[in-house]
Amino acid sequence: GDECGLYIVRNGVVAYDNIKLTATANEDGSITWQPDAETKLMGGLSNENYFLYYPYQTDMNGKVDASANEPDDFFATLISGWQPAADQSTYASYAASDLMIADGTTTKGTNGTLSLSFTMSHAMALAVIKMPTIVYQFTNANVKIPDYVNKATAADFTNSDLQPYGIAPGTYRYIVNPVNGTAKNITGKYAAGSKEFAFTPNITNASSYKTYKVDGAATIKKAHTLQPGDYLLSDGSLIGKDKTLTDGQKAACVAIVFYAGHHTSDGSDYPETGIGQSKCHGYAVAVDDAIPHPSRGAMWGVNGGSVGTKSNGYSEPETDWNGYKWTQKIIDAAGGVGKLNATTQEGYPATYYAVVAHEANCKAPAGSSGWFLPSIGQMYYLYENRTSWLYGQVKITIYGNYWTSTEYFTNDAVTMLFGDYGQSHYEKAWRFGVHSVLAF
């Protein structure tokens, strides 16, 4: 658990010096801080002060003032010399930079025990970075597509002296020392690298925050003709297929658009996903296989019973674009996402790889449906129209025989062969490739 340091001061003299306390969670959600079993604490005298700080430091020599009565004064040297990490991009480094302090009050318990209560306050200050929202207004002449609102605009801090922590889509945080500040800048780019920003996060009051709104955190409207071959980045940004990508954009590309608009044969309902409405804006295919070569191959699921994804898609592929809907039915048959697994038929391995494993390797944009196992109609369309999306600036890994989410019989599910074209069906215990798609 988390660790903090405790001081007990009697008559201006430190009686207990930097005692390590470790947090344990209680059933009611509260937290109890306990010393190790060998450490016995005695207190409760009228002339005692109790001070706590977090996170624990092994070297506290010369960093406290035993004559002080308030935590700000007691820990003044610790606070002034505290150096928040330059790289706070992970939660661990962000939390380790957030110095907190407290003084304690005592409550007498049974059998002569004494409980200490602390209310922690932040000794540092917080810079909050808000990114703009980009609204893609689609200009397609042949299909009407509603605006695509990307609230998760990501910043690229690759070359920044200071690296903030992404607390939520489009929002970042950085811990700053209010006593001595920083002379370094937070610099970044967004909008696929086309826009830049910079600021120095100096905040003078402890336990306070300042919001930095990049370009006013405004809503930026952007005209875009959505077409197969467009690039969908990890933050939900779209880049047209005719634009030249930077190396950073290539690395951030998670999927390629293969269809613009909501297909009329898609009976999926998307309001509970990141899309937030019934109909999607388009569909995109993952850059990489869900099961890497050469170990590729997963069972579809349980033989001898339908999960409800059979359709006319085998003979009429264009009528079945229900990949997301079918994937949810398979998940229900497994007993929930947590019951999917890679090894047993009851765990529906193909769906596990499409939904769980691929998400672990390549996070879907926040404003999307999330990854799912495509239906036969979606896989058929991908194959038939591969020249429109397959040969762009980002290399796509897709070759071989792939499962779809569409059933054929109770024992069989439909596959699509990329390379030498072939649409077929096999028993669900057979092992084939898995390639994820998403709607956005």
State the predicted function of each range.
Residues V14-S30, K151-I167, F199-N202:
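Solvent-exposed serine/threonine-rich low-complexity stretches and specific carbohydrate-binding patches
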Residues I101-Y174, T182:
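Short helix-loop boundary/capping segments
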Residues G1-L126, K130-I134, P178, K210-V214:
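Short, low-hydrophobicity acidic/polar segments
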Residues F51-Y53, L126-K130, I175, A284-A286, ...:
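Residues within well-ordered beta-strands of beta-sheet-rich folds
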Residues S369-G370, I376-F440:
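C-terminal, surface-exposed recognition/capping segments
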Residues N159-Y209:
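Accessory, usually C-terminal, subdomains that scaffold auxiliary metal cofactors
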Residues K189, T204-A206, K210-G367, K428-A439:
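Short, compositionally biased
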